[in-house]
């Protein structure tokens, strides 16, 4: 495929070719993707300098997946190369700070996923894991460093149990990630320390009221763990609430049934 767009502030035309290929071998599929993607810098950067160029990402993916009799597994390697990121630079003469499009970075890792709907009656479980290494030279970071939002290890397990007579599904989800990086002024380097690991145990119940009405309720972090999302002045940044509640009603107005209760 091919995409092009024109950005008026920078007066630049962006060309984004993309190629995807799949090879099927029985119940297995091999896939490869290479593509160029662009996006505008964030609004707060464009306000300071509207002439900033669109940020660029060259993405490469190689994956394999296997699907057989209710069991599905997938593994994917990826590499992303970033260019023209917004970067704060200082004029050598005036010492004025200004934004340029000279930032760059990369991200690489592996995604693993497994789902089993066949081993146990009325029960489905999922396992997922992501390993990621990300580096950026952008914004106020004048050397390659790990962004504040990037965590190296992310994992989750999900168990769903169906209650056909009650037309309901009960789910339990446990999410884990290694600590987010933050800058500790007592240590050398940038983004040189991590907060404690993240963990959240969530519960959910889905009720099929009719073929076109689904009611879903969930609550997160039932153990009320104090998860940290960074540090400012050596004080932990916490969520506004230890856990959240959600209740949603999904109604299909068309003739066809569009919602699949097993997706909740």
Which residue ranges define each predicted feature?
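Signature of Gram-negative outer-membrane beta-barrel scaffolds
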Residues: 1-25, 40-41
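Transmembrane beta-barrel strands of outer-membrane/channel proteins
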Residues: 2-4, 21, 32-36, 64, ...
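Residues on the lipid-exposed face of transmembrane beta-strands in outer-membrane beta-barrel proteins
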Residues: 19-23, 62-66, 110-116, 127, ...
